[in-house]
Amino acid sequence: MKMRRYKLFLMFCMAGLCLISFLHFFKTLSYVTFPRELASLSPNLISSFFWNNAPVTPQASPEPGDPDLLRTPLYSHSPLLQPLSPSKATEELHRVDFVLPEDTTEYFVRTKAGGVCFKPGTRMLEKPSPGRTEEKTEVSEGSSARGPARRPMRHVLSSRERLGSRGTRRKWVECVCLPGWHGPSCGVPTVVQYSNLPTKERLVPREVPRRVINAININHEFDLLDVRFHELGDVVDAFVVCDSNFTAYGEPRPLKFREMLTNGTFEYIRHKVLYVFLDHFPPGGRQDGWIADDYLRTFLTQDGVSRLRNLRPDDVFIIDDADEIPARDGVLFLKLYDGWTEPFAFHMRKSLYGFFWKQPGTLEVVSGCTMDMLQAVYGLDGIRLRRRQYYTMPNFRQYENRTGHILVQWSLGSPLHFAGWHCSWCFTPEGIYFKLVSAQNGDFPRWGDYEDKRDLNYIRSLIRTGGWFDGTQQEYPPADPSEHMYAPKYLLKNYDQFRYLLENPYREPKSTVEGGRQNQGSDGRSSAVRGKLDTAEG
């Protein structure tokens, strides 16, 4: 009798374990692409995977009598930092809070036939019926026209519309996508279409855009910072920029970015900049440079997020090095769509000294997640996000269980489709010199410790040949400024201003090389010209 009870008890235990395993397996399957027919069985099941709207931090409500937020002519709907008196503007820049605005831009339009189309990615929003060509609505890339018949995407979509106009609806509602855009609503860029995202079948436009926070540590990469502001200025809602009066090596340095922020250099974007000031150097950072490197990102994240107001848990947080610039289209997708997993990375085009030395492959940088995950899993520590260790964090299982999301890291772009740019050591020779002497004491060998490596003529020779400080030479593939994703658009539009980043300033002139070829001797080239060309090629 006892044996029978034990057997019955064991059978119930095994059945329970099988049921739990099956449920977990089914939950995992929900993040793997499967037939649309199965997905369409339960719209409520799909919607349960999207974010809730509870704030991750307490929302700041304005106190009675507070002054209105300042606004600028360029961005009339975006708040500047809290107004300060002129005498305290520079003193308290690193103490003011930043109120995240709501993005009211009309990214999507609804056609008369009921379709929902992404304006910048759509050529034709509605098929005209015979004899009524006047109703044909077209939106070219970058168009900002808004007619009275176009309604903003600010209302609740039906389940059928949120599933991308599938089934029979596709027969009479159609968005014709421009090159580089995909999906039923033409809002999925190429860098997502050809990515390893496992949930492409679940992508749906959001009712309300997320806000995007981009956090950066700055040393002296001011040209690249200017490029970042122009590339992402209309899709990022807050640039959190950390400035310090110490270099990564622990030496004093002037607050150049703070000066540029207050003297009008970045006036066009100042209303979107949250200034973070690190006024100390971490203990032990001089002996172990990685302590300083990690602490910079930790302080940037914690101080910056603590001063952001009106945050929502589904807002996007992206932390970059100053020489890493994500492409606009990928960031805009994260802002406007539901259904992608986290954390996410970017496949970036790699360059050295300038965009003219294109390195093979891509740099895959894990740099983003939602604010909810940043707080719950990473503990508001940006360096943990960068290290791909979400599965070792003690709270990541609790986060999965609470949100119902399986954490699956993915990358925007691919080795063949760049989703950004990583331009390493992209300075003038003087800028490279400053980077050498400012570098942390942890990435050995520390080339700034060698006097010959700091010589400006030696640095110019490295830029000319594409060589490295250890004397090695690499065979880089040819790069042409006309190729796709050669450099951010703002650089190409201001070619003369940034010529030193787009063309090799120390490349041997073509006239000299051609003249040398014409004066070749019986051995193929004269000794003098051979010496010059060998130096150029070496």
Curated annotation (Swiss-Prot):
Disruption of the gene: reported phenotype: Knockout mice are generally healthy, fertile, and behaviorally normal. They have altered leg clasp reflex. They show a lack of N-glycan species with an additional bisecting N-acetylglucosamine. Knockout mice crossed with Alzheimer disease model mice have significantly lower levels of the beta-C-terminal fragment of APP (betaCTF) and soluble APP cleaved at the beta-site (sAPPbeta) in their brains than Alzheimer disease model mice. They have markedly decreased the number of amyloid-beta plaques and ameliorated cognitive function.
Region feature (Disordered): 120-161, 507-538
Protein induction: Expression is up-regulated by CDH1/E-cadherin-mediated cell-cell interaction.
Membrane topology of the entry: Single-pass type II membrane protein
Record keywords: Glycoprotein, Glycosyltransferase, Golgi apparatus, Membrane, Signal-anchor, Transferase, Transmembrane, Transmembrane helix
Cytoplasmic topological segments: 1-7
One protein family per Pfam: Glyco_transf_17
GO BP field: amyloid-beta metabolic process; cellular response to oxidative stress; cognition; lysosomal protein catabolic process; N-acetylglucosamine metabolic process; negative regulation of lysosomal protein catabolic process; positive regulation of protein localization to early endosome; protein localization
Keyword Calcium found: no
Catalyzed reactions: N(4)-{beta-D-GlcNAc-(1->2)-alpha-D-Man-(1->3)-[beta-D-GlcNAc-(1->2)-alpha-D-Man-(1->6)]-beta-D-Man-(1->4)-beta-D-GlcNAc-(1->4)-beta-D-GlcNAc}-L-asparaginyl-[protein] + UDP-N-acetyl-alpha-D-glucosamine = N(4)-{beta-D-GlcNAc-(1->2)-alpha-D-Man-(1->3)-[beta-D-GlcNAc-(1->4)]-[beta-D-GlcNAc-(1->2)-alpha-D-Man-(1->6)]-beta-D-Man-(1->4)-beta-D-GlcNAc-(1->4)-beta-D-GlcNAc}-L-asparaginyl-[protein] + UDP + H(+)
Protein name: Beta-1,4-mannosyl-glycoprotein 4-beta-N-acetylglucosaminyltransferase
EC number: 2.4.1.144
Transmembrane segments: 8-23
Quaternary structure and partners: Interacts with MGAT4D.
Subcellular location: Golgi apparatus membrane
Gene Ontology terms: cellular component: Golgi membrane; lysosome
Pathway listed: Protein modification; protein glycosylation
Glycosylation sites: N245, N263, N401
Result when mutating D243E: In strain: 129/SvJ
Family note: Belongs to the glycosyltransferase 17 family.
Organism of provenance: Mus musculus
Side Lumenal, residues: 24-538
Entry comment describing in which tissues the protein is expressed: Highly expressed in brain and kidney and to a much lesser extent in stomach, heart, intestine, uterus, testis, ovary and lung. Not present in spleen, liver and muscle. In brain, expressed in neurons of hippocampus.
